[in-house]
Amino acid sequence: MRRSSVTNRQSLLPLRVQDANRMGLTTPQNKDRQGFGKLSMSKPHSGTSEKKTSFFGKRASNGTARTSQYGAFGGTEKIKDPRPLHDKAFIQQCIRQLCEFLNENGYSQALTVKSLQGPSTKDFLKIFAFIYTFICPNYENPESKFEEEIPRIFKELGYPFALSKSSMYTVGAPHTWPQIVAALVWLIDCVKLCCVLRSENPVFEDPPMGEQSENGIDFNQLFLDYTVRCYDQFMEGRDTFEEYDTDVCIRLKEAYHVDESNLEALQQESRRLMEEIERLEKEKENEPDRLASMRKLKASLQADIQKYQNYLTEIESHSTLLDQRVSSISEELEATELESRAIQQENLRLKNILDNQKYSVADIERIKYEETELQQTIAKLTKDLDEDKQQLWHEELKYAKMKESVETQLSEFHKIGRKVRLIPPTAEFANGYDFQIQCNLDSEQSSLMHYRNKINVPLVEILSQSEGHIASSTNKKMGVEDMVEQLNTLIGEKKNEVKVQKDEAQKLEEIYQQKVEESEEHEKRWISEIESLEKHRQLLESGVNKSLDEAMKDLQKEQQELQLVEHRTEEEMRQVENKLVRVVHAVANHVAVIEKHLEEKRLKVEREYEEFMKEDLLLDLRELLEKYKEKARVLDSL
């Protein structure tokens, strides 16, 4: 006996007294029965919520609600599929699970989610065989009647929903692929569950009899004693065994050292885990494609990082330019300081001379006047210097704006050149010329006029070539349009012919219907005559018994004539039908011949068009000109 079936088990024998509150011998059917591989996520029930009855009586809930691993066993009614097979998000999730399983387990081909949107029947057979080999390693795809073999395998595995034979022929169709991919995901769940069961220790296996395994013989002896005592009480007429249930529970708890104080903590832990699972499921429902959103966020962040790196590079280059300017300005400042020191020394020397020297009042006045003039000159020069600096600042701003606009125009020029395939030199229309403008606007050697002269000549050459190509293409297009117009005219004529043939067929159909109506009228007339003759026969039988033989003979004659007339009518109808069938076949053949002729004309025109496109147009014109010249010579000679 298995240990998992000891604590709460239904009675193996029927009750003597029928009790509506007790369970019968039928297998209980769970309405929420899930398929194999779907784990039950129902909330755990308290082990003490129901009163225990017989050890084999009502089963007290002591854990999660058990679901069938092999589908529903009771009844053959068709179960409605609760899965949202019409939901695109659900189907895409199933396809991703299938793709991940195949790639992780070494499938022979590298698959993507896009390649699994609508696979062929051959690919489906390979995928099914690869997955099913995890359950049955010796399985091989059947050479024939796979449409019967695969649904049978799913049915044997306990797949709760039916797969039709027709769905095996159109696996990749939009109306059948959701059912197939859901079945494959169910099969993957089966494989995962089998792998888990194989990897686990055989905890629930029956201990071998006769060996001193841990609690093995005690357990078997305990169960056998309980069974014997319950059976004895059952044979005596009892249906409930509460005292034996209580006794065996106590002995089992002692045997397995069950601590009831930990049950509440375990139940709280179980409830916490269930709440955590529900929270994670809600998060998954709210964010079904969180990985894709995180990848997009990662890509945007990487793009921002790249932008910031480019910005830092530009800042570093700008900082380098500023350092160069600072160094040049510092050198100028040092030179200015040296010049200022020299001027100060000169002023000291002159002041010393002035102190040692005696001046007259006129000299002092003259010196003051010269000093005033020099101060005015210095103020004027200082003002001019400030104005020059302000002008230089404005010129630098204009230069920066002009440089920025030139760089924008250069980038736009390069962008347009790549778009029209002129850049790089190896592009389609570059003809080996380098149209890229790579110049440093800060350097004095750069000259846009040099690049303008370098690029202008090849551009003019390419422009002239393009105009020639455009003119030749325009001429070709006009010729093709004329040819298409001729073809449309020919097709219109053929359509008119087909319309005439259809009108003739309709007329023949009307004639046939008229003949059928005439035959029906003849038949009705003969039926009415037969009815009148039958009435006449009845009158003769009731009125005159003597002329019965003569009336019978007359009736036979009339019947023979009727048969002859019916035979003639059938022959006429058969002839009319044969004629009509021949006419319809002739019309259909004629229509088929016309369609074939039109198809040949179309193919011929396409071939001529291809040959026409391959041929040199000027060669045909030259030949035509020569022919006209020859005809003109002949006419002149005449």
Swiss-Prot record:
One of its GO terms (cellular component) is nucleus. One of its GO terms (biological process) is chromosome segregation. GO terms for molecular function: kinetochore adaptor activity; microtubule binding. Keywords: Cell cycle, Cell division, Centromere, Chromosome, Coiled coil, Kinetochore, Mitosis, Nucleus. Residues 1-11 have a biased composition (Polar residues). The keyword Cell cycle applies. It comes from the Eukaryota. Residues 249-394, 479-638 form a coiled coil. It holds the Pfam family DUF5595. InterPro entries: DUF5595, Kinetochore_Ndc80, Ndc80_CH, Ndc80_sf. It is found in: Nucleus; Chromosome, Centromere, Kinetochore. Residues 1-55 are annotated as: Disordered. The keyword Nucleus applies. Component of the NDC80 complex, which is composed of ndc80, cdca1, spbc24 and spbc25. The NDC80 complex interacts with mis12 and zwint. Interacts with cep57r. Acts as a component of the essential kinetochore-associated NDC80 complex, which is required for chromosome segregation and spindle checkpoint activity. Required for kinetochore integrity and the organization of stable microtubule binding sites in the outer plate of the kinetochore. The NDC80 complex synergistically enhances the affinity of the SKA1 complex for microtubules and may allow the NDC80 complex to track depolymerizing microtubules. May play a role in chromosome congression and may be essential for the end-on attachment of the kinetochores to spindle microtubules. PANTHER family: KINETOCHORE PROTEIN NDC80 (PTHR10643), KINETOCHORE PROTEIN NDC80 HOMOLOG (PTHR10643:SF2). Belongs to the NDC80/HEC1 family. This is Kinetochore protein NDC80 homolog. It comes from Xenopus laevis (African clawed frog).
